Swiss-Prot record:
Main function: Proton-selective channel gated by extracellular protons.
Annotated source species: Xenopus tropicalis (Western clawed frog)
Cell compartments where the protein resides: Cell membrane
Record field: transmembrane: 113-133, 144-166, 183-204, 217-240, 249-271, 318-334, 359-378, 393-415, 508-529, 541-563, 615-632, 652-674
Name of the featured protein: Proton channel OTOP3
Any one GO cellular component localisation term in the record: plasma membrane
Effect of substituting E321Q: Abolishes proton channel activity
Amino acid sequence: MLSKEEPACRQFHSREKTWGNEHNGKTVTQANNKEHKVPAVRRGDIGQREPAAHPASHIQGTMASENTGEQATCKDQYMDLDAPGNNLEHSWLHRHCEIPTTLHQRAKKTGRLFSGLFGLNLMFLGGTVVSSVALSNKAVPERDSQSFLCILMLLSSVWALYHLLFIRNQNGAVHHDHHAGAMWLKASLAIFGVCSIILSIFEIGHALLLQNCEILMDIVFFSIEIVFVSVQTVLLWVSCKDCVQMHHSVTRYGIMLTLATDILLWLTAVIDDSLEQDLEILQSNSTQDESNEMAQCQCPTDSMCWGLKQGYVTMFPFNIEYSLICATLLFIMWKNVGRREKLHSDPPRHTFQLRGIIYGPLIGGAALLVGISVFVQYQVEATSGMVSILSYHMYYGYKMIILAPMIVCSVAGIIAHSLREKEKKGQKETGRSDQDWLHMEDVGSENKNTDYSSGQYQSSQGDEKIQGYSLAQFALDNEKEKLEHRQGNTTKKHNTHQGKMKNYTRKLDVTLLFVSAVGQLGISYFSIIATVVTTPWTMLSALNFSNSLLLILQYLSQTMFIIESMRSIHEEEKEKPGHHEESHRRMSVQEMHKAPPSCLDAGHLGLSRRVVKEMAMFLMICNIMCWILGAFGAHPLYMNGLERQLYGSGIWLAILNIGLPLSVFYRMHSVGILLEVYLHA
């Protein structure tokens, strides 16, 4: 009986030999040394199997052969991960644990717990400091929060350089998670990072041109932010796929420090952006002395200082998105620290193509052009301070026009996914039936060839017995496969030596999608209540009510479509592409002629796939337009006055300042996921 300290592969080999001794009376090694090859259960081996001596021994031999294959896979690909010389994680709390792999798992969980608590407390502390500047009526000076953030950015930059220059250069220090760090995410990281650096440059120029204001701390803060953004962008571009196997504690705490810094910078940018939106209200409620003090640090509208201010105000949405993207990538890196799972091979690369996709890009492009025209026209009037009723009607009318088709497209995409799943199930059953008949024919032909080569005469009655026996043998094989499918064949569906390959990126995407959707849903429900209570109803009230209701339906339907699409992608990734490729390679020319058209026409873009691609492309373009409407310039929710009359300026502005940043992130995050859906469909 083996002890638990032995590696998993050796235990599996021992169980394999024990099973063979109990049921066959012979070891698996002896079974493999026979001249008679044991047939495999895989359908790709049709045409290569030989009849066994007895159905029961056939099933036993098959299971023995499969276990041997799994042992080879485990030994060749994954045994090196748990070898004694490798870097297993240790923890002082679990020092009495004598099993290395168990100690590694417990130490990993303990490291996640303490580093997570460290990051959480740091976020709460920094969030209190940053928000106190805006809520304490200048009792907490802004330079205190800037000094705190400067310390965090410097420490994070030092850790990032240490990770890039020291940890990653050691042998065996890094494995890779191929699910993390999608190309569209890295491209967004680079673009938004450049925009954040430009924002800091504009802030420095704006601070230098101000007079009678304290500018030294502002210059220091934005200079350090430029260094931090540059180092962090390089770190995440290079290391976003890393599964670090050395210096686990330093890496976890460094990642949490950097992640907390990004969250606090995001909160600072959200507060600054909200204060720019609320500036007129703050000035109207302030005293004369406060207004004079605020006017001393304002730029004339016709100066270069005013132009730089408009520049960094325009860059706020990019900086907000940059901080959130960095936080998501860092969270995946933190989850992957100490992870000792490896894929069999790299996942397939998907290229962006518009072949056969016409209506989605065409209609979406038209909606984008019209939306930009409406947006520019509204912002011109909002900048002048006088927004006409016609501009409100055009703004809300345009949103209603695009929201209704987005709802229809989301529902159509969900239906297309269900039809596609049904079609794939039918093709799988058809292919299995055809392969079964091919197997029966091959078994019969092999029996006849064997009889003729041995010179033995077979009567018609003997042929019927052989065919009946072959059918019985095949029925036993088929029942065994169905039983394994129902109970779950753990040796086949696990991609790693420690279990099923986890995809932390996809789980995080779904979580962020749900959390960010709460912002717009809350705003919409508050708007609906305010519109219903306010009397009498006007055209603007009706448009606001309809727009809020359509937004709720659109968020719910699009979220369901995205989740259903990601589930479909996950189901496709669970299938073994190498197994199917091997099966197709083993098909002879005669079998290809006998195969149904559905098996040979796999590259054809079916109706359900085309519908999913069309819907994903249209929704992606419309979400880009909705992101532009919510992220840039003035927003009608600040200016129409319906909700402000019911809730008051302070409460309504607080609702908007919390909900709108989440809504903006939802749109941008949806664009990335919809692009992934389009590529995988």
